């Protein structure tokens, strides 16, 4: 099953994920993958996430949390945050494990 590591930018989620899953297929910067698929290619965020989960059932997904903080003025930036949030909700639902990373320390939330 999928494992999701999420945290703020530069909080160490990629290092922790790779340390805990050295042999697994990893997808770092998944928030940027969502940006390309949804905003550039016009895919719907949840549909993209469902397809991804079906195609990569044992993946280690690593993403930045982008939904906290000040709401961007730019509509495209707001759409990006919304798409990432919706897609990661699907991934988290499908995941066997969800770990939130702060200062390099993982806290398992699922």
What are these language model-derived features?
Residues 4, 16, 39, 73, ...:
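Generic detector of leucine side chains in alpha-helical contexts
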Residues 3-9, 38-40, 76-78:
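Short, flexible loop segments at the rims of nucleotide/cofactor-binding pockets, characterized by
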Residues 1-22, 26-28:
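Glycine-rich P-loop/Walker A and Walker A-like loops and their local beta1-loop-alpha1 context
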Residues 11, 32-33, 67, 106:
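Short, solvent-exposed loop/turn segments at secondary-structure junctions
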Residues 19-43:
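Conserved substrate/cofactor phosphate-moiety recognition/catalytic segment
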